[in-house]
Regions:
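Conserved ATP-binding subdomain of kinase catalytic cores across diverse folds
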Residues: 1-26, 32-69, 74-159, 197-380
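Sequence-structural signature of the catalytic-core scaffold of metal-dependent phosphohydrolases
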Residues: 137-192
Protein backbone atom coordinates (compact mmCIF):
# COMPACT_ATOMS: atom_id res chain seq x y z
CA UNK A 1 0.00 0.00 0.00
CA UNK A 2 1.42 3.42 -0.93
CA UNK A 3 1.18 6.54 1.23
CA UNK A 4 -1.71 8.06 -0.73
CA UNK A 5 -3.86 4.96 -0.33
CA UNK A 6 -2.84 4.72 3.32
CA UNK A 7 -3.83 8.34 3.97
CA UNK A 8 -7.20 7.87 2.34
CA UNK A 9 -7.77 4.71 4.39
CA UNK A 10 -6.96 6.37 7.70
CA UNK A 11 -9.18 9.35 6.99
CA UNK A 12 -12.00 6.90 6.25
CA UNK A 13 -11.28 5.20 9.58
CA UNK A 14 -11.54 8.53 11.39
CA UNK A 15 -14.92 9.15 9.79
CA UNK A 16 -16.10 5.76 11.01
CA UNK A 17 -14.90 6.53 14.54
CA UNK A 18 -16.02 10.16 14.75
CA UNK A 19 -18.74 10.43 12.13
CA UNK A 20 -19.84 13.99 11.49
CA UNK A 21 -17.49 15.27 14.20
CA UNK A 22 -14.48 15.04 11.86
CA UNK A 23 -13.12 18.53 11.15
CA UNK A 24 -12.46 18.69 7.41
CA UNK A 25 -10.37 21.85 7.63
CA UNK A 26 -8.18 20.02 10.13
CA UNK A 27 -7.58 17.18 7.68
CA UNK A 28 -6.64 19.74 5.03
CA UNK A 29 -4.20 21.35 7.46
CA UNK A 30 -2.73 17.95 8.30
CA UNK A 31 -2.06 17.22 4.65
CA UNK A 32 -0.29 20.57 4.41
CA UNK A 33 1.89 19.62 7.39
CA UNK A 34 2.67 16.30 5.72
CA UNK A 35 4.01 18.18 2.71
CA UNK A 36 6.13 20.52 4.84
CA UNK A 37 8.97 18.12 5.58
CA UNK A 38 9.93 14.67 6.92
CA UNK A 39 9.69 15.54 10.64
CA UNK A 40 6.16 17.02 10.52
CA UNK A 41 5.23 14.14 8.21
CA UNK A 42 6.32 11.66 10.89
CA UNK A 43 4.29 13.52 13.51
CA UNK A 44 1.21 13.63 11.29
CA UNK A 45 1.20 9.98 10.26
CA UNK A 46 1.43 7.67 13.24
CA UNK A 47 -1.09 5.43 11.54
CA UNK A 48 1.38 4.91 8.68
CA UNK A 49 4.16 4.06 11.13
CA UNK A 50 2.01 1.26 12.54
CA UNK A 51 1.58 -0.15 9.04
CA UNK A 52 5.26 -0.25 8.08
CA UNK A 53 7.42 -0.41 11.22
CA UNK A 54 7.54 -4.20 11.55
CA UNK A 55 8.33 -4.43 7.85
CA UNK A 56 11.28 -2.10 8.44
CA UNK A 57 12.43 -3.76 11.68
CA UNK A 58 10.93 -7.28 11.83
CA UNK A 59 13.39 -8.34 14.52
CA UNK A 60 11.64 -6.03 17.00
CA UNK A 61 8.37 -7.94 16.81
CA UNK A 62 9.69 -10.44 19.37
CA UNK A 63 10.58 -7.81 21.99
CA UNK A 64 8.53 -7.98 25.21
CA UNK A 65 5.26 -6.09 25.01
CA UNK A 66 4.42 -3.18 27.29
CA UNK A 67 1.85 -0.42 27.43
CA UNK A 68 3.79 1.98 25.22
CA UNK A 69 3.34 5.59 24.11
CA UNK A 70 3.24 4.64 20.43
CA UNK A 71 3.25 8.12 18.90
CA UNK A 72 6.49 9.21 20.53
CA UNK A 73 8.79 11.84 19.02
CA UNK A 74 11.01 14.73 20.11
CA UNK A 75 8.11 17.13 20.63
CA UNK A 76 5.93 14.78 22.67
CA UNK A 77 7.42 16.00 25.94
CA UNK A 78 6.42 18.93 28.10
CA UNK A 79 5.75 20.13 31.62
CA UNK A 80 2.82 20.13 34.01
CA UNK A 81 2.12 20.55 37.70
CA UNK A 82 1.37 17.45 39.75
CA UNK A 83 -1.16 17.16 42.58
CA UNK A 84 1.25 18.83 44.99
CA UNK A 85 2.08 21.68 42.61
CA UNK A 86 5.53 20.37 41.71
CA UNK A 87 6.89 21.03 38.22
CA UNK A 88 7.14 17.76 36.27
CA UNK A 89 8.55 17.05 32.81
CA UNK A 90 7.81 14.07 30.61
CA UNK A 91 5.67 12.58 27.87
CA UNK A 92 2.48 14.63 27.71
CA UNK A 93 0.41 13.13 24.90
CA UNK A 94 -0.92 9.61 25.25
CA UNK A 95 -3.55 9.46 22.49
CA UNK A 96 -2.01 6.44 20.74
CA UNK A 97 -1.03 4.39 23.79
CA UNK A 98 -1.31 0.65 23.21
CA UNK A 99 0.38 -2.64 24.05
CA UNK A 100 3.28 -3.28 21.67
CA UNK A 101 6.98 -4.29 21.70
CA UNK A 102 8.81 -1.85 23.97
CA UNK A 103 11.60 -1.31 21.43
CA UNK A 104 9.23 0.42 19.01
CA UNK A 105 9.04 3.50 21.25
CA UNK A 106 12.84 3.73 21.23
CA UNK A 107 12.97 3.28 17.47
CA UNK A 108 10.40 5.96 16.75
CA UNK A 109 12.05 8.44 19.12
CA UNK A 110 15.45 7.91 17.49
CA UNK A 111 13.91 8.16 14.02
CA UNK A 112 12.31 11.48 14.94
CA UNK A 113 15.71 12.75 16.04
CA UNK A 114 17.23 11.90 12.67
CA UNK A 115 14.38 13.53 10.76
CA UNK A 116 14.46 16.68 12.89
CA UNK A 117 18.21 17.16 12.70
CA UNK A 118 19.78 15.78 9.55
CA UNK A 119 23.25 16.87 10.67
CA UNK A 120 23.08 14.63 13.75
CA UNK A 121 24.47 11.11 13.56
CA UNK A 122 22.23 8.11 14.15
CA UNK A 123 24.83 6.54 16.42
CA UNK A 124 25.00 9.56 18.73
CA UNK A 125 21.22 9.87 18.97
CA UNK A 126 20.81 6.16 19.61
CA UNK A 127 23.56 5.97 22.24
CA UNK A 128 22.06 8.80 24.26
CA UNK A 129 18.55 7.31 24.16
CA UNK A 130 19.82 3.84 25.06
CA UNK A 131 21.92 5.19 27.94
CA UNK A 132 18.88 6.99 29.30
CA UNK A 133 16.71 3.92 28.89
CA UNK A 134 19.25 1.82 30.79
CA UNK A 135 19.21 4.38 33.61
CA UNK A 136 15.43 4.25 33.71
CA UNK A 137 15.39 0.46 33.86
CA UNK A 138 17.75 0.66 36.82
CA UNK A 139 16.02 3.50 38.66
CA UNK A 140 12.59 4.40 37.23
CA UNK A 141 10.74 7.50 38.33
CA UNK A 142 9.22 10.80 37.23
CA UNK A 143 11.29 13.84 36.33
CA UNK A 144 10.27 16.19 39.15
CA UNK A 145 12.15 19.44 38.60
CA UNK A 146 11.70 21.44 41.80
CA UNK A 147 14.85 20.09 43.47
CA UNK A 148 16.67 17.98 40.87
CA UNK A 149 17.62 18.18 37.20
CA UNK A 150 18.51 21.88 37.31
CA UNK A 151 19.60 21.89 33.65
CA UNK A 152 16.21 20.56 32.56
CA UNK A 153 14.34 22.98 34.79
CA UNK A 154 16.31 25.84 33.24
CA UNK A 155 15.45 24.62 29.74
CA UNK A 156 11.68 24.37 30.31
CA UNK A 157 10.98 27.29 32.65
CA UNK A 158 9.01 30.00 30.87
CA UNK A 159 10.73 33.42 31.01
CA UNK A 160 8.64 36.17 32.59
CA UNK A 161 8.45 38.11 29.35
CA UNK A 162 6.92 35.17 27.51
CA UNK A 163 3.92 34.50 29.74
CA UNK A 164 1.89 37.26 28.12
CA UNK A 165 2.45 35.61 24.74
CA UNK A 166 0.35 32.66 25.91
CA UNK A 167 -2.63 34.91 26.64
CA UNK A 168 -2.13 36.97 23.49
CA UNK A 169 -2.12 33.82 21.36
CA UNK A 170 -5.29 32.53 23.00
CA UNK A 171 -6.98 35.85 22.36
CA UNK A 172 -5.94 35.89 18.70
CA UNK A 173 -7.27 32.39 18.12
CA UNK A 174 -10.53 33.16 19.90
CA UNK A 175 -11.11 36.30 17.85
CA UNK A 176 -10.24 34.48 14.65
CA UNK A 177 -12.90 31.91 15.51
CA UNK A 178 -15.53 34.43 16.59
CA UNK A 179 -15.41 36.45 13.35
CA UNK A 180 -16.40 33.35 11.38
CA UNK A 181 -20.06 32.85 10.63
CA UNK A 182 -21.91 30.00 12.28
CA UNK A 183 -21.90 28.11 8.99
CA UNK A 184 -18.12 28.48 8.64
CA UNK A 185 -17.25 27.26 12.13
CA UNK A 186 -16.64 23.64 13.12
CA UNK A 187 -19.62 22.40 15.12
CA UNK A 188 -19.34 22.25 18.90
CA UNK A 189 -20.74 18.83 19.66
CA UNK A 190 -22.35 18.36 23.09
CA UNK A 191 -19.81 15.91 24.53
CA UNK A 192 -16.93 18.39 24.11
CA UNK A 193 -18.80 21.21 25.79
CA UNK A 194 -19.88 18.87 28.59
CA UNK A 195 -16.31 17.66 29.16
CA UNK A 196 -14.96 21.21 29.26
CA UNK A 197 -17.60 22.40 31.70
CA UNK A 198 -17.08 19.34 33.91
CA UNK A 199 -13.38 20.09 34.33
CA UNK A 200 -13.55 23.83 35.03
CA UNK A 201 -13.31 24.69 38.74
CA UNK A 202 -16.66 24.87 40.55
CA UNK A 203 -17.84 28.46 40.69
CA UNK A 204 -16.19 29.51 37.43
CA UNK A 205 -17.94 32.19 35.42
CA UNK A 206 -19.64 31.27 32.15
CA UNK A 207 -16.83 30.13 29.80
CA UNK A 208 -16.04 31.30 26.31
CA UNK A 209 -15.53 28.25 24.09
CA UNK A 210 -13.87 28.11 20.67
CA UNK A 211 -12.32 25.68 18.22
CA UNK A 212 -8.54 25.39 18.38
CA UNK A 213 -6.20 24.12 15.70
CA UNK A 214 -3.08 22.67 17.33
CA UNK A 215 -0.73 19.73 17.14
CA UNK A 216 -0.17 17.73 13.98
CA UNK A 217 -1.18 14.11 14.45
CA UNK A 218 -4.57 14.97 15.93
CA UNK A 219 -5.59 17.43 13.19
CA UNK A 220 -8.99 16.45 11.90
CA UNK A 221 -10.23 15.53 15.35
CA UNK A 222 -12.31 18.14 17.19
CA UNK A 223 -10.29 20.26 19.64
CA UNK A 224 -11.96 22.94 21.74
CA UNK A 225 -10.84 25.44 24.37
CA UNK A 226 -12.81 26.89 27.27
CA UNK A 227 -11.65 30.03 29.09
CA UNK A 228 -13.39 31.26 32.22
CA UNK A 229 -12.86 33.65 35.11
CA UNK A 230 -12.28 31.97 38.47
CA UNK A 231 -11.02 33.45 41.73
CA UNK A 232 -9.70 36.61 40.13
CA UNK A 233 -8.15 35.41 36.87
CA UNK A 234 -8.49 33.14 33.86
CA UNK A 235 -8.48 29.36 33.84
CA UNK A 236 -8.23 27.42 30.57
CA UNK A 237 -9.11 23.86 29.58
CA UNK A 238 -8.65 22.07 26.26
CA UNK A 239 -10.73 19.13 25.03
CA UNK A 240 -9.97 16.89 22.06
CA UNK A 241 -11.32 13.65 20.66
CA UNK A 242 -9.53 10.38 21.30
CA UNK A 243 -10.15 7.22 19.31
CA UNK A 244 -8.69 3.71 19.64
CA UNK A 245 -4.96 3.66 18.91
CA UNK A 246 -3.90 3.32 15.30
CA UNK A 247 -1.73 0.43 16.49
CA UNK A 248 -4.78 -1.63 17.43
CA UNK A 249 -6.43 -0.73 14.11
CA UNK A 250 -3.58 -2.40 12.22
CA UNK A 251 -2.46 -5.16 14.57
CA UNK A 252 -5.78 -6.05 16.21
CA UNK A 253 -4.08 -6.33 19.58
CA UNK A 254 -5.52 -5.00 22.81
CA UNK A 255 -9.02 -4.40 21.52
CA UNK A 256 -10.53 -0.94 21.27
CA UNK A 257 -9.69 0.25 24.76
CA UNK A 258 -8.51 3.85 25.09
CA UNK A 259 -5.62 3.65 27.54
CA UNK A 260 -4.62 7.30 27.92
CA UNK A 261 -5.37 7.51 31.63
CA UNK A 262 -3.78 4.15 32.40
CA UNK A 263 -0.44 5.17 30.89
CA UNK A 264 -0.57 8.76 32.18
CA UNK A 265 -1.05 7.58 35.76
CA UNK A 266 1.37 4.65 35.71
CA UNK A 267 3.36 3.50 38.72
CA UNK A 268 6.39 5.68 38.03
CA UNK A 269 4.53 8.84 37.01
CA UNK A 270 3.74 12.09 38.85
CA UNK A 271 0.57 12.67 36.83
CA UNK A 272 -1.22 15.83 35.83
CA UNK A 273 -4.32 15.85 38.07
CA UNK A 274 -6.23 17.96 35.52
CA UNK A 275 -5.82 15.40 32.75
CA UNK A 276 -9.00 13.38 32.28
CA UNK A 277 -10.82 11.38 29.62
CA UNK A 278 -14.60 11.81 29.64
CA UNK A 279 -16.84 10.11 27.08
CA UNK A 280 -14.03 9.76 24.54
CA UNK A 281 -12.79 13.31 25.11
CA UNK A 282 -9.36 14.03 26.62
CA UNK A 283 -9.27 17.22 28.69
CA UNK A 284 -6.19 18.98 30.02
CA UNK A 285 -5.34 22.25 31.69
CA UNK A 286 -3.59 24.91 29.60
CA UNK A 287 -1.32 27.35 31.38
CA UNK A 288 1.41 29.87 30.52
CA UNK A 289 3.62 28.07 33.04
CA UNK A 290 3.64 24.82 31.08
CA UNK A 291 6.03 24.42 28.20
CA UNK A 292 6.81 22.16 25.27
CA UNK A 293 10.05 22.67 23.37
CA UNK A 294 9.51 22.78 19.60
CA UNK A 295 12.23 21.89 17.13
CA UNK A 296 11.91 24.85 14.77
CA UNK A 297 11.25 27.65 17.26
CA UNK A 298 13.72 29.66 19.35
CA UNK A 299 13.84 28.62 22.99
CA UNK A 300 14.21 31.63 25.27
CA UNK A 301 15.76 31.07 28.68
CA UNK A 302 16.64 33.35 31.55
CA UNK A 303 20.37 33.95 31.98
CA UNK A 304 22.38 36.11 34.37
CA UNK A 305 22.84 38.82 31.74
CA UNK A 306 19.27 38.59 30.40
CA UNK A 307 17.22 36.23 28.22
CA UNK A 308 19.12 34.09 25.74
CA UNK A 309 17.79 32.14 22.77
CA UNK A 310 18.66 28.72 21.42
CA UNK A 311 16.93 26.86 18.62
CA UNK A 312 14.67 24.23 20.16
CA UNK A 313 16.15 21.52 17.93
CA UNK A 314 19.59 22.05 19.43
CA UNK A 315 18.26 21.53 22.95
CA UNK A 316 16.10 18.53 22.07
CA UNK A 317 18.95 16.78 20.27
CA UNK A 318 21.50 17.46 22.98
CA UNK A 319 22.75 14.37 24.77
CA UNK A 320 21.27 15.29 28.20
CA UNK A 321 17.78 15.74 26.75
CA UNK A 322 17.88 12.53 24.71
CA UNK A 323 19.03 10.64 27.80
CA UNK A 324 16.16 12.14 29.78
CA UNK A 325 13.71 11.06 27.08
CA UNK A 326 15.07 7.52 27.13
CA UNK A 327 14.83 7.38 30.90
CA UNK A 328 11.25 8.63 30.77
CA UNK A 329 10.27 5.89 28.32
CA UNK A 330 11.76 3.21 30.57
CA UNK A 331 9.81 4.58 33.53
CA UNK A 332 6.60 4.45 31.50
CA UNK A 333 7.25 0.92 30.22
CA UNK A 334 8.05 -0.51 33.65
CA UNK A 335 4.56 0.36 34.85
CA UNK A 336 3.30 -2.61 32.80
CA UNK A 337 2.66 -5.40 35.28
CA UNK A 338 5.27 -8.18 35.29
CA UNK A 339 7.11 -6.72 32.28
CA UNK A 340 10.19 -5.42 34.07
CA UNK A 341 12.43 -8.48 34.10
CA UNK A 342 11.54 -9.48 30.56
CA UNK A 343 12.31 -5.98 29.27
CA UNK A 344 15.59 -5.77 31.18
CA UNK A 345 16.69 -9.18 29.92
CA UNK A 346 15.78 -8.42 26.31
CA UNK A 347 17.35 -4.95 26.43
CA UNK A 348 20.65 -6.40 27.67
CA UNK A 349 20.65 -9.23 25.13
CA UNK A 350 19.72 -7.05 22.16
CA UNK A 351 22.92 -5.03 22.32
CA UNK A 352 23.30 -1.50 20.98
CA UNK A 353 23.72 -1.53 17.21
CA UNK A 354 20.06 -2.21 16.40
CA UNK A 355 18.74 1.24 17.28
CA UNK A 356 21.03 3.38 15.11
CA UNK A 357 20.68 0.94 12.22
CA UNK A 358 16.90 0.73 12.55
CA UNK A 359 16.45 4.48 12.91
CA UNK A 360 18.49 5.12 9.76
CA UNK A 361 16.37 2.65 7.78
CA UNK A 362 13.11 4.08 9.13
CA UNK A 363 14.16 7.69 8.55
CA UNK A 364 15.06 6.90 4.93
CA UNK A 365 11.65 5.30 4.35
CA UNK A 366 9.76 8.16 6.01
CA UNK A 367 11.67 10.75 3.98
CA UNK A 368 10.91 8.87 0.75
CA UNK A 369 7.20 8.62 1.54
CA UNK A 370 7.08 12.29 2.49
CA UNK A 371 8.65 13.24 -0.83
CA UNK A 372 6.13 11.06 -2.65
CA UNK A 373 3.24 12.66 -0.79
CA UNK A 374 4.56 16.19 -1.28
CA UNK A 375 4.77 15.62 -5.03
CA UNK A 376 1.02 14.89 -5.16
CA UNK A 377 -1.10 18.06 -4.76
CA UNK A 378 -4.25 16.30 -3.59
CA UNK A 379 -5.13 13.02 -1.94
CA UNK A 380 -7.27 11.17 -4.48
Amino acid sequence: MDILTSTKGYEAYLRIELGREVVDEGLTEKRSEMRAGPFPFLRATYWRWTEIVLELAPELASAPKVLAVGDIHLENFGTWRDADGRLVWGVNDYDEAAEMPYALDLLRLATSGLLAGAEHKAEAIAEAILDGYAQGLEDPGPAVLDRKLAWLREAVMVPEGHRQEFWDKLKRKRKKFEVRTEAERPKLWPRYEAALRATLPPGSDEPRIWYRSAGVGSLGRPRWVAQAQWCGDWVVREAKAVVPSAWTRVHEAGGRSIRCIEIATGRYRAPDPWYRVIDGVAVRRLSPNNRKIETDKPLSREAEDGPEETLGRDVLLGRPMLEAMGRELASIHLATKDAGEDVRRDFAARGRAWLAKGAAVAAERIAAEQAEFAATPEVP
